[in-house]
Amino acid sequence: MTPWFIVTKQFTPNDGNAWSKYIQRSGLTQLTELVSLDTMLCPTLLPKIKDDYWAHIVNEDFMIRFFVDFDFLMEQVAGIEKKNVLCVFRNPTQQPMAPPVANFEFLGFDLLETYGSDTSALTNCEGFPDVFANSELSSVGLLHEFERAVDVQTRLRSMHPEEPHADCDLWAIFRAVGI
């Protein structure tokens, strides 16, 4: 499993009305912050791909916002104070370990639509109560356990085959501490 890196916008109660509306709409009252790869809720802080990025990013359809070179990424975001520096693994086959390039803490698993929109089935689809309960999500909106995340991924696909947001990739998410 290869780690990828991304820096996303923080989404917290400090976002005022946007946060309040999101909590009201989603019903995720346990959240103290949302950490997700959902591009509508937690967009990347480097939305434009510069020419010098190409040697340092994932060169795959819909994945060019992810970096493979942690040090290069950190140089690009050095001047940004409020940010989530994330290490992620797409479709891990077991619980991954973050590389020692920074002090990363494991936050949990997200499930994002496989093709194109990067919408989280956990936090941006108004829930799938027949598959998982909102109360299963952590204070940052993620599933804690690998086995449960795989089960939710499998059940979303089998119980909602017509729903594009239910065809998901599983993402393990770690956040850098102290950066």
Language model region names:
Residues 1-60, 91-137, 166-174:
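Short aromatic-glycine-(Arg/Gly/Cys) micro-motifs in beta-strand/loop hairpins
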Residues 39-96, 138-142, 148-179:
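Short, mixed-charge low-complexity intrinsically disordered segments
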